[in-house]
A protein has these predicted regions:
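An acidic/histidine-cluster motif and surrounding catalytic segment
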Residues: 1-111, 122-159
Length: 159
């Protein structure tokens, strides 16, 4: 299969993202291209992916509007019916606190969340246990290729 042809845009709406991750645009583009080459079997071979790096307030609004949950979350995906694929929004504060609490590197955790969102755009989900195992396996394999430890083996610290 030919590699996926993707148009990838990255918008930074919260300055802390750039301060903590200076190479984010290059890294995110590489991450999505790697993921597409590895996981695109069931999804479109080309499309537009927009990544918005924002804050908890924005993710809380999106989560309330689209999922009926009045709280922030780490990542949301928005499939686009007009263009193949869609958008991914990631909340800085939530990702930062999760990474700290789970003793993960911030950039590694942020990459995992973006990858997770991208796999949702490709049609993967984790509602059913079997599908969750498949999605986690793909995430783990791609992250391992990028030199990032399996995020599911890292234990959360007690609160």
């Amino acid at each position: 299969m030919a590699p996926a042809k993707l148009e990838i845009t990255v918008a930074v709406e919260h300055a802390a993202w750039k301060a903590r991750w200076p190479t984010l645009k290059r890294d995110i583009s590489g991450l999505i291209k790697t993921a597409a080459a590895r996981a695109v079997g069931d999804g479109p071979a080309s499309g537009v992916v927009s990544v918005v790096l924002t804050d908890d307030a924005a993710l809380k609004r999106f989560n309330r509007q689209f999922r009926g949950k009045n709280k922030p979350t780490n990542v949301l995906s928005f499939p686009d019916s007009a263009e193949p694929l869609g958008g991914i929004a990631v909340a800085y504060e939530t990702v930062f606190h999760e990474a700290s609490g789970q003793k993960k590197k911030f950039i590694d955790h942020a990459k995992h969340m973006i990858l997770h969102g991208f796999l949702h755009l490709l049609g993967y989900d984790h509602v059913v246990k079997r599908e969750a195992r498949l999605m986690e396996g793909i995430e783990t394999a791609i992250l391992t290729d990028l030199g990032i430890p399996n995020p599911y083996l890292i234990e959360k610290t007690s609160a």
